[in-house]
């Protein structure tokens, strides 16, 4: 078990999401990004984060695809990461401990390939955009949800000049 391997201390609090929620500040004209002034991680902490992301990536791809966004976010910040990255890793481990019985259910369907996709403009570090997608088999009315065939959660390498380009 990955949680035992990483000597994870279980929290009494239940974690409902794999990453921390950043509340939206309505009414502001400009939404500023948070600056991370925390100290950088040590080499041992970087190795720990790499081991956790590597171990949980298999589980996330196979069973709990909700972890993919958090894993992608943590993995992109690992080399220049700070203690905030380490806290995000511990949050992900708390989520995994709170939700140990993930499952995917496949049911008989009309075999219609459905796709939900989206992109977020300038959401990732270094002014990059993020893309996400969810492909599954279901019915033509999109009322039947089935287990995923492909889940995409990645950062687009190139900087887009407008919000329409990543879409």
Give the role of each language-model region:
Residues 1-167:
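Long, low-complexity, charge-biased intrinsically disordered regions
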